[in-house]
């Protein structure tokens, strides 16, 4: 069976209830959502480091189980 996957890019600095609402809605349409955290070392740092954002997202999306994957990219 083919897995339906969505990519949700953003800075997530920090993740908000609005982000979580979009994730819930997306998971009603696809099997997996990849949260792609954007960062740019050439710009001033935001509120949280990439590692802190990843940890926050892991904590608040734990209930979604393996339907959520978190990655980061430079952009």
Segment roles from a protein language model:
Residues 1-75:
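Nucleotidyltransferase catalytic core that binds NTPs
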């Amino acid at each position: 069976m083919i897995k339906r996957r969505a990519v949700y890019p953003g800075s997530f600095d920090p993740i908000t209830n609005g982000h979580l609402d979009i994730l819930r809605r997306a998971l009603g349409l696809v099997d997996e959502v990849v949260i792609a955290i954007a960062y740019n070392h050439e710009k001033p740092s935001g509120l949280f480091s990439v590692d802190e954002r990843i940890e926050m997202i892991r904590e608040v999306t734990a209930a979604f189980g393996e339907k959520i994957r978190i990655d980061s990219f430079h952009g």
